[in-house]
Structures are given as C-alpha cells and as structure tokens.
Swiss-Prot record:
UniProt-listed Pfam families: fn3, I-set, THB
Name this polypeptide is given: Myosin-binding protein C, cardiac-type
Organism: Rattus norvegicus (Rat)
Every Fibronectin type-III domain range: 774-870, 872-967, 1068-1163
Boundaries of every Ig-like C2-type domain copy: 8-95, 157-259, 361-452, 452-546, 645-765, 971-1059, 1181-1269
PTM description: Substrate for phosphorylation by PKA and PKC. Reversible phosphorylation appears to modulate contraction.
Modified residues (Omega-N-methylarginine): 1241
Basic and acidic residues bias locations: 95-104
Modified sites of kind Phosphothreonine: 117, 287, 607
Disulfide bridge positions per record: 436-443
Residues covered by region (Disordered): 95-153
SUPFAM superfamilies per record: Fibronectin type III (SSF49265), Immunoglobulin (SSF48726)
One of the record's GO cellular component terms: M band
Length: 1274
C-alpha cells in the first residue's frame, strides 16, 4: 500500500500486462483507472482502436477491457492504453498451438505422483476443496520448500518491479523464499526495499534465525534482486505480506499471502479437515477448535468452496485507508483506531506516522497568519496583526471562543489588508487563546501575560523568644496579592494538621505566625518570591528568670511603712510572698502589688510583730529572694529634767555603718533623739575634705598618749523642710529624706543635737549605687563566613558595684530589631558570635550588668558583613611547557560566597622544598596564567588560591611536579569532521576554513592548491600557534579545487586534503522540443543544461502558458527526468512551454522555452470559417453626453461628467481656462466605459471658470465645455 503522502506513479491502479496466446484464441487486456468516468483510449502501433468485429471495447466503472478476437499472426505487436497523462504499453505475442500428446504426457505424471509425496498432501486437500489452477506467474513450492517463479511471467515495463513476489504455501517446519526484482538501469541510487507483515510490522526488526533478508545486484543485467527467506515456518508465519520499493521520486508496492499447512502423515489424512470452517475464506489457514461446527458436517460447503473463494474477493468491501484515518484523528484516538484495525505494533505505527509528510492546506483568506504564541509583560501593550487576501473582508476577533467588543482596552485597526487587535494594559485576565475569523477560516494564537518579578521591599527581622512565646515574621512585597513561599532551613512550610504555622496576608504584607514556639522551631526562616528572598534567624531559649533588682533589708520604727520591692526579667511571672517560710496573706495593712516586672510588698503601721524574714518566690522557678525587717524599738526611760541630748542609733558613732541605697530609690534616715529640753537637730553633709592637722594631747593626758589626728571638712547645712532633700524634726526624732537618690547624694552626713545641757553628734555614711555606665562601642575582628569576634572595654563607671558580666546584642543593619545573643552573663571582654548569615550586614552593641541592674546599651559597632574565604579552585591542569615557561589553567571554585572573587594568586616551589615563590605580583582575574622566567630542567609544584575580601581560600596544588623543559611533539592536523567531506559554498559567499593542529615547537604551515602554492590577493592564509585559517572574502568558481595543508617540524610532517566546491545557479536546459501531441496531452523533451553550476542537477520545473493570456502556470516541480507529459490541456488553445533547471543553489535565471505555440486540435472534421472582408470600426471622437454648467458650494467635492465614444479609444485631456489639469493633484480624472469624470476636491471660489474636456484619436478630435460657478456658503 503506497504511503498517503506520495503522489501516485500512474493514473492506472491496474495495468494491462503483456500476454502470449495461441493462434485462434482470444486475448483480453484489462485496465483499472483511479476514478470512474476517466476517458480511456486504446492504441496499436500509435493508431487509435475503434470497436468492430475484431476488437471489443468495454468500460464498467473504473474497469476497462480490450478484447482481441480470433488472434492471428497479424495481431502480434505493441499496444498501448492512454488515460489522462498516463500511457501504458504492452505486447501481444502469438504462438502456434502445441500438440495435444505432449500436454497429456506433461499432466499425467503429476497427477500420479501427487499422492506419493508426503509434502504434497495439502495439495490433495486443496484439490478436494475444488481449488482452481494457480494463475500465470505464481510461485510454487519445490522439494526443499523454495519458491520458484514461472519462467513465462511477463515483465512490467511501467512499475518499478520486474518480478513481483507471488502468493506461496508451505508446510509447518518448511522453508520458503519470496523474490522481487527491480530494474536499476534508470536509477541513480539503489532502491530502498521494505518487507512488511500485515499493515505495520516491519520485518527488518524481526530478522533472526527463522527470518532473513538478502539483496544482490547483477551488474550485467543491471537488476536488483531482493529476497525474503522464511525457515522453519510456523502457523504464526501465515498471513498477508507486503513488499515496498521506493526511489527518490517513485514508489511501488506489492501484496502477497503465505499459507502455512499443518504437517500430516500419509496415513493420517483426515478428510474432515476439508469441511472445517476457517476464519479467513480462501486463505487455507486452519483455525482453532473453537471455530469448528459442533454436530454433523456440512458437505455443501465443500461443493461451494471454489465459487465462494472467487466471489469473496469480488464482494470484499474496499479497504479503509488507515493512514488517512490516523492523520485526521487526534493522538488520543491512536490506540482505539489501532485496536479496531488490528494493529499490534504501535511503536512502528507511530514511527511511520511521524515520518509521513503532512500536506497543509494553504489558506485562501489569510496571507499572513498569527504567530503560534505571543508573550507580553503585565501592564504593557500587545498588538496582534494578520494580513488578509481580500482587503475588504470583515474579521471577528474571539477570546476563548467569545467575540471581543471594542472598548478602551481593546482597539481594532484596519489598514489596507492588515487587521490589528491592540490590547493595552494587559492583565492576567488577558492570558487566553485568541482567534481571528474571516468567513469560514480562522487562525489562532495564544497570549501569555508575564508577571514582573515580585520584589521584597522590607526584609524579615531576626527574633529571639522564649519557649511558649508567640513568633511573628513580617515582610512586605512590591505587589498586592503576590504568591510567596515560606521556608525553614530550606524546606517549604505548609499548613500542618496541628496548624502550627499560620500564614496571613494583608495587602502587600505577609506574615508567618507561630503561636507557641518550641526549641525545634529555632533555625533560619526565609520568604521567597519570584524576584528574590529574605532570610531571618529565630532563636528559641528556655525560660530563665533574671533578677534585675532584689529585695533589701529594712530597719523601720513603729508606725512606719516598710516596702520590699524586687524586679525580674519576665513581666508575666507571678510570685508568692512568705513571712518566716509561711505564705503571707494580704489584708488592709499588708498589700501585695505586681506591676510589669516589679513585685512590691507594702506593710503599713509596722509593729514589733512584723519583724521577721520576708521572701519572694516566683512561680515556676527555683528562685528565692529574701530580706529581713528590723524593728527599731524606742525605749522611753524616765530621766530627770535638764537631760543632755542623745542620739539613739544601733551603731556606735565612732564607726558608723554605711547605708546603701539604690539610685532612684527613696532614702529615709529616721534618727531617734532625746533630751530635755528638746534639742536642736542640725544635719550637715561633708562636701570637701581638707588637710589633716596634728593636735597635741589634751591637757592631763598621759605622756605616752599619742597626738590625735583630726580631719577638716567643709560641710553643707541641710535645713530645707520641703523639696527632694528635706529634714523633718519632732520632739523625739529627726527624719532625713532624699527622694530619688542620685550619685551626688553620696557622702558622709553629720547629725548634731544640742540643748543647753550639751550636745551629741553622729556621722552617717550614705553610699548610692547605680547601674554601670554604657560601655564604649564594641570592635569587630576576625570576621568569618558566619562568625566574628566582638571585643569591648569595661564601662568607665561601674555604678558603685562590681560588674558581674555583659550582655551582647546584634541586629541587621537595615532592621530595627535587636536580638540578644546570650542569657548567661559574659565574664570576659570578648565573645565569638556565630550563626550569622553570610552576605548580610550586621551591627553589635553591649550592656554591662552589676548587682543593681543592666546599663544602657553601648553605641552600635561599625557595620560588618560575615564573609568567608572562597573555596579552592578546581581542575588545575598544565596546558603547555617550554624551556622557561609553564602554562596553567584552572576553573573557579565551586563555592564563591557572598564576597565574590577578587582574583587568584599563583605560587610555585621546588620539589622537596617548602618555600613557595609568588609567580605573579598581585592577583589575576583570569583562570589561566603563563608563568615565565622559570629555571630550565627544574621540577616545580604549582598552587593556586582564590582571594576575596575575607582573604585567601584553600589552595589547589598540582598532583605531580612539572619538569620545565620543552617537549617535542609530533605535528598533527586535527581536521574537523565537517571538513573531511566536500566543502560546498555558493558564489559570492565568504570561505573561512579553520584547521587546528598540534606540534612542538611551533610547526611550519604550508598551503597548496592542486599541488601549486597559493597565490593571489583573493586567498589569504592566517596562522597561529594552534591553528591555521584559509580565508576567501568572496568565492568564485575558479576557487574550486583540491587544497592541501601541511604542518612540518624538522623531518616530521602531517598533511590533510580539503575539497572546495564553489557552486552557482545552473544554465537553462537545451533543445526543448515537442515530441508528440495527442488528445489533451503534449509530450516534451529537452537536454540537460550545459552548465550545471558545478553541482548536481536536482530537477526541473515545467511551466505552461496559454497563448491568449500568456500567464505562466507550473505543471511539474522538482522533476528529475528530461522528458514529461503535460496533460489536461484545453482543446483549441495554443500553449507555450518553458523549463527551468534546479540545483542546490536555486533555479536557473532563464528558461528554455518553445518558440512556437502548440495548438491542441479538435478531433473530427476541421472547421474552416468563411472569409469575410474586414470591417473598419474606426470612428472619430464624439460626445454622446456633453458637459453641463454647474453651480456648487465651496468646500464640498464636486464632479463634472460627460460621455464620449470613438475608435480607437481616444485620449482624454481636461482644461480649465485653457490650462491643462493633468498634473494638478487637486483634480482626479476617471474614465470607465466611455464615461468621463473630473473630481474637484474641496473647491474654492478660485476654481470657478470654464472647463473643457478634449478627446483625441487618429481619426480626429472633439471637445465640450461648461462653466462652473463656486458659491461661498452664507
């Protein structure tokens, strides 16, 4: 079955064959055409055959028959049948009748030997079934099972087959050979033959032990022989086969069947097998037992077998063209169609279907269709343009099958034959399929709207939380509704069943929320968009309570107020107050408060029963804050009047205790006094210490008593009763109060009581402690890939208490959130910070902590960026070595890092030495280097390191030492693969042939052409140390030839040959002539062109032109032969023919054309028209409708019309007031069927006047005139 995509070779589907008949009998020739109704002519020796007593002509649909009755020696000769442009020739041979005795003797032995051979038992069964004799030319099975064709089989002079494979039969286990012969005299290349079983199975993929394909070529007869060998045949080998032969421009195929019989012994012949029904009538194949009839045998089927065979072939329905069905079906239907038609080799079917040519129907409505797809950025404009064949055609634009209406965003444009759809401000809703419909045709395209990358405008912030706290990461992107992905340590986060992660969108803001953080949630979190990503670190710490301010011991008197206050790090922590280990229950006098991080216990009207140990225990933490309340009891003793004043304190006056107060707290000194009369209390503060002076011993003192040393102080009197520092005095006590103690309040306070009886004095030392001052800005050093060293100095003032440690914080430079790096206080003045993100700028600050609390933060450090050194370079190789140089080459490191690469350093050292010498001052950005000035013969090791702002990375070292010495390398040409075959270039094209070579030292390069050195300015040679180039700027035919390049080093050389072929367009064919004309066809012949353009002629293009119109139409394209038949011409017309030649460059510039027209005569009597005297139709011009006076309005187009007749057609001229209007662009002149029109565009009053129309031809001249008045509108 021929491939659907190929043009049929002949108009006949069945061709008449040459026959040999006995004299006196009848000869019948049959032919079948492609379609019914096609006119068929029979000829003998070039003369048409008409129906008479000798010849019988019959036509039935597509079937045409020629019968030659009572054949005699005179009837022997050449016959032909013509249908359309196809002509088939065949021969009739007449032989004398053979003696009847020889025929009987030839038949008798065959019938007697038939039952003796076991292999011929199936033939007996065939005879029992009523099988007819095999047709002429069929194959037969020999003793060894081979198939031999009939010696009398005629050759087919039209098809490609000289001998076609015939149907055959074989017994199970036997062998059979099918042969096909193809004539090769007219073929330029060997034909391609394929063997198929069924419709699809290509037997070339089944070649093995039981199936082999052979081919041979007989040079004497120029005949190709192709054979299909089937050995050890099985029942599965039976079926229909097909042989296909194809050349470059022809194709032919032949179907044949193979019947496989079961092996049956001579004594086991079962006559019942002759009456079993088979699945395929007439094929002789035995079916399975499931197809046999149960019950009695039907002997009538045996008698009707032969007739059923003959009728089944005639009544079989026409076979469906499966190729055409598959071509029109979608790929999803391939499997169903293959199943319906019994196709099992789906892979072979798809392979063959893919190789078929798809004949696309050329559009008649569109000259230029839409592209398959368009792409546009979101918010931009797109134009979809088509070009129509009819400029006046109406178009409709569809979007997803719905018609588009014109609006502000959709604009339709029509410019000539172009139709344009413009879509402005494209959005994602415009991403759809679009169609342009013109009448019944349409072209489709698809528009893809590309969104711009979504950028992150505000990055994520690092966070430090405790276990159980809520975490929320927030970022802001450039587009609302953008899709983002959240990742943790590189793994995408999803909404789990526990809803651990919650994602929130608010306009351009995106949030990742973790309700209760756990230790497993710590890590690096990232948000990723189409335009980038942002990273942040989450640190989760276990809860650890810190005490910023502990409770202190108190000493109060009766009826006073006692306040215990402490401050912890967590404001959500609650606690319990204990008194001597028992929980304290609040009442009207005892109050407990919790405000933020401050817990306070207040006791009003202190009594002696309140003196005890008080403790605060935070809930959930193993922590206990304790303090003691001292009750100062005032004892009232009876004293006589005139009692000297006395200050009653627990501490002796000579060595007073230091009273410590925290800055910002309230200081209250309650000093009990006594004396009668009531003493005067004086409070003083020592502000300046003077020089000490020596004093002699008091009078009456012992001699050995040493001199007392006294200090002289400048004292400040404190007597204010209101304000921050105040003194309140009653009869029995004096109270000194300082609100919000400050550092300036620190010092020695003197209390003096006086009355007439005497005085008493006590010194009280007050020390104010505070948080330390803020340390100086920390310094950053040793910055690594994800770590750095932070160093700082102690604070200038420690707050009066030793510094217990330091707290370190960091933040990203563009962020506002500081993240704490340590919970345990740092005792040292340096710390190594880790877990930073490479390439992100950070800042550091530090806090100092003492017993009072934490200082203010230090100024931020200078911004720094963690950057690690790059990795080591890879693939370090030695490219070349000379006596003093070594060429190195390497690749960049696999890990570059955020710091990029500043360059590479190269070093070398002697083998066995550890001292590396720099080979290059500074860094090189290239990945190769030529190290010069090396000692000859030295064995050196080389290493390369990559550098960036973080410093050098790891080195890569050559595996073995390199000997610095020139290596003698044999010259060798490395000819590229595409230069090993003939190099074809078109005339005028540049030629650039680059040939690499090897060899050391540098070889000498020599070019020659046809054995002669190259000369001339048009050919230039360029040589380098590694290659040579042959360059021709503009190629000419003279540059064709054989070029040889030679590389030589001393007595060693290597050669390569290149064949350059410069090709051009061929010259036109020669000597075109008309060989024969018959019916509606003309046979042409020509000779190949004299100049083939220096390349093979690919074919010819044949064109025809009617003598009347001289419009050329292509009849044949890429036609290989030098003769052809042009058919389907019109009777009575004359035609010119011309032929172009083609090669790989193109078609010839000129064509070979017939000089005289070829007329297609009408069959039958030739009509001779009567001769008449020619009439003279010439006539002088005359106006049948003259011009009329008109009055028009200015600004509106006006038309002047008249009608003229004349022969030949007169020349028309228009005048205004005697001036010719032919070159004035404001006037348009028309002439159609004798009607003359003058159009005046937007006339003005100046256009008024007398207009004249003049008509002139060879016979005379005529003119008419009118007056035109142009009125101005009022």
């Amino acid at each position: 079955m021929p491939e659907p995509g190929k043009r049929p070779v002949s108009a006949f589907t069945k061709k008449p064959r040459s026959v040999e008949v006995t004299a006196g009998s009848a000869a019948v020739f049959e032919a079948e055409t492609e379609r019914s109704g096609l006119k068929v002519q029979w000829q003998r020796d070039g003369s048409d055959i008409a129906a008479n007593d000798k010849y019988g002509l019959a036509a039935e649909g597509k079937r045409h028959t020629l019968t030659v009755r009572d054949v005699g020696p005179d009837d022997q000769g050449s016959y032909a049948v013509i249908a359309g442009s196809s002509k088939v020739k065949f021969d009739l041979k007449v032989t004398e009748p053979a003696p009847p005795e020889k025929a009987e003797s030839a038949v008798a032995p065959t019938s007697m030997e038939a039952p003796e051979t076991p292999k011929e038992v199936p033939a007996l069964a065939t005879q029992l079934e009523g099988n007819v004799s095999s047709p002429e030319g069929s194959v037969s099975v020999t003793q060894d099972g081979s198939v031999a064709g009939s010696q009398g089989a005629p050759d087919d002079p039209i098809g490609l087959f000289l001998m076609r494979p015939q149907d055959g039969e074989v017994t199970v286990g036997g062998s059979i050979v099918f042969s096909a012969r193809v004539a090769g005299a007219s073929l330029l290349k060997p034909p391609v033959v394929k063997w198929f079983k069924g419709k699809w199975v290509d037997l070339s993929s089944k070649v093995g032990q039981h199936l082999q394909l052979h081919d041979s070529y007989d040079r004497a007869s120029k005949v190709y022989l192709f054979e299909l060998h089937i050995t050890d045949a099985q029942a599965t080998s039976a079926g229909g086969y097909r042989c296909e032969v194809s050349t470059k421009d022809k194709f032919d195929s032949c179907n044949f069947n193979l019947t496989v019989h079961e092996a049956i012994g001579s004594g086991d012949l079962d006559l019942r097998s002759a009456f079993r029904r088979t699945s395929l009538a007439g094929t002789g194949r035995r079916t399975s037992d499931s197809h046999e009839d149960a019950g009695t045998l039907d002997f009538s089927s045996l008698l009707k077998k032969s007739s059923f065979r003959r009728d089944s072939k005639l009544e079989a329905p026409a076979e469906e063209d499966v190729w055409e069905i598959l071509r029109q079906a979608p790929p999803s239907e391939y499997e169903r169609i293959a199943f319906q038609h019994g196709v099992t080799d789906l892979r072979g079917m798809l392979k063959r279907l893919k190789g078929m040519k798809h004949d696309e129907k050329k559009s008649t409505a569109f000259q230029k269709k839409l592209e398959p797809a368009y792409q546009v950025n979101k918010g931009h404009k797109i134009r979809l343009t088509v070009e129509l064949a009819d400029p006046d055609a109406e178009v409709k634009w569809l979007k997803n099958g719905q018609e588009i209406q014109m609006s502000g965003r959709y604009i339709f444009e029509s410019i000539g034959a172009k139709r344009t759809l413009t879509i402005s401000q494209c959005s994602l809703a415009d991403d759809a399929a679009y169609q342009c419909v013109v009448g019944g045709e349409k072209c489709s395209t698809e528009l893809f709207v590309k969104e711009p990358p979504v950028l992150i405008t505000r990055s994520l912030e690092d966070q430090l939380v405790m276990v159980g706290q809520r975490v929320e990461f927030e970022c802001e992107v450039s587009e609302e509704g953008a899709q983002v992905k959240w990742l943790k340590d590189g793994v995408e986060l999803t909404r789990e069943e526990t809803f651990k992660y919650r994602f929130k969108k608010d306009g351009r803001k995106h949030h990742l929320i973790i309700n209760e953080a756990t230790l497993e949630d710590a890590g690096h979190y990232a948000v990723r968009t189409s335009g980038g990503q942002a990273l942040a670190e989450l640190i989760v710490q276990e809860k650890k309570l810190e005490v910023y301010q502990s409770i202190a011991d108190l000493a109060v008197g009766a009826k006073d107020q006692a306040v215990f206050k402490c401050e912890v790090s967590d404001e959500n922590v609650r606690g319990v107050w204990l008194k001597n280990g028992k929980e304290l229950v609040p009442d009207n006098r005892i109050k407990v408060s919790h405000i933020g991080r401050v817990h306070k216990l207040t006791i009003d009207d202190v009594t002696p029963a309140d003196e005890a140990d008080y403790s605060f225990v935070p809930e959930g933490f193993a922590c206990n804050l304790s303090a003691k309340l001292h009750f100062m009891e005032v004892k009232i003793d009876f004293v006589p009047r005139q009692e000297p004043p006395k200050i009653h304190l627990d501490c002796p006056g000579s060595t007073p205790d230091t009273i410590v107060v925290v800055a910002g707290n309230k200081l209250r000194l309650d000093v009990p006094i006594s004396g009668d009369p009531a003493p005067t209390v004086i409070w003083q503060k020592t502000i300046t210490q003077g020089k000490k002076a020596s004093a002699g011993p008091p009078p009456g003192a012992p001699e050995d008593a040493g001199a007392d040393e006294e200090w002289v102080f400048d004292k400040k009197l404190l007597c204010e009763t209101e304000g921050r520092v105040r003194v309140e005095t009653t009869k029995d006590r004096s109270v000194f109060t300082v609100e919000g103690a400050e550092k300036e309040d620190e010092g020695v306070y003197t209390v003096t009581v006086k009355n007439p009886v005497g005085e008493d004095q006590v010194n009280l030392t007050v020390k104010v402690i505070d948080v330390p001052d803020a340390p100086a800005a920390p310094k950053i050093s040793n910055v690594g890939e994800d770590s750095c060293i932070v160093q700082w100095e102690p604070p200038a003032y420690d707050g009066g208490q030793p510094v217990l440690g330091y707290i370190l914080e960091r933040k990203k430079k563009k962020s506002y959130r500081w993240m704490r790096l340590n919970f345990d206080l740092l005792r040292e003045l340096s710390h190594e910070a880790r877990r930073m993100i490479e390439g992100v700028a950070y800042e550091m600050r530090v806090y100092a902590v003492n017993a009072v609390g934490m200082s203010r933060p230090s100024p931020a450090s200078q911004p720094f960026m963690p950057i690690g050194p790059p990795g080591e370079p890879t693939h370090l190789t030695v490219e070349d070595v000379s006596d003093t140089t070594v060429s190195l080459k390497w690749r960049p490191p696999e890990r570059v890092g955020a710091g990029g690469l500043d360059g590479y350093s190269v070093e070398y050292c002697q083998e066995g030495c550890s001292e590396w010498v720099t080979a290059l001052q500074g860094l090189t950005e290239r990945t190769s280097l030529l190290v010069k000035d090396l000692p000859t013969g030295a064995r050196l090791l080389f290493r390369v390191r990559a550098h960036n702002v973080a410093g050098p990375g790891g080195p890569i070292i050559t595996k073995e030492p390199v000997t610095v010495q020139e290596i003698l390398q044999r010259p060798r040409l490395q000819l590229p693969r595409h230069l090993r075959q003939t190099i074809q270039k078109k005339v005028g094209e540049p030629v650039n042939l680059l040939i690499p070579f090897q060899g050391k030292p540098r070889p000498q390069v020599t070019w020659t052409k046809e054995g002669q050195p190259l000369a001339g300015e048009e050919v230039s040679i360029r040589n380098s140390p590694t290659d040579t180039i042959l360059f021709i700027r503009a190629a000419h035919r003279t540059h064709s030839g054989t070029y040889q390049v030679t590389v030589r080093i001393e007595n060693m050389e290597d050669k390569a040959t290149l064949v350059l072929q410069i090709v051009d367009k061929p010259s036109p064919p020669l000597d075109i002539r008309v060989v024969e004309t018959w019916g509606f066809s003309v046979a042409l012949e020509w000779k190949p062109p004299q100049d083939d353009g220096n390349t093979e002629i690919w074919g010819y293009t044949v064109q025809k032109a009617d003598k009347k119109t001289m419009e050329w139409f292509t009849v044949l394209e890429h036609y290989r032969q030098t003769h052809c038949v042009v058919s389907e011409l019109i009777i009575g017309n004359g035609y010119y023919f011309r032929v172009f030649s083609h090669n790989m460059v193109g078609s010839s510039d000129r064509a070979a054309a017939t000089k005289e027209p070829i007329f297609i005569p009408r069959p039958g009597i030739t009509y001779e028209p009567p001769k008449y005297k020619a009439l003279d139709f010439s006539e002088a011009p005359s106006f049948t409708q003259p011009l009329t006076n008109r009055s028009i309005i200015a600004g509106y187009n006006a038309i002047l019309c008249c009608a003229v007749r004349g022969s030949p057609k007169p020349k028309i001229s228009w005048f205004k007031n005697g001036l010719d209007l032919g070159e004035d662009a404001r006037f348009r002149m028309f002439c159609k069927q004798g009607v003359l029109t003058l159009e005046i565009r937007k006339p003005c009053p100046y256009d008024g006047g007398v207009y004249v129309c003049r008509a002139t031809n060879l016979q005379g001249e005529a003119q008419c005139e009118c007056r035109l008045e142009v009125r101005v509108p009022q």
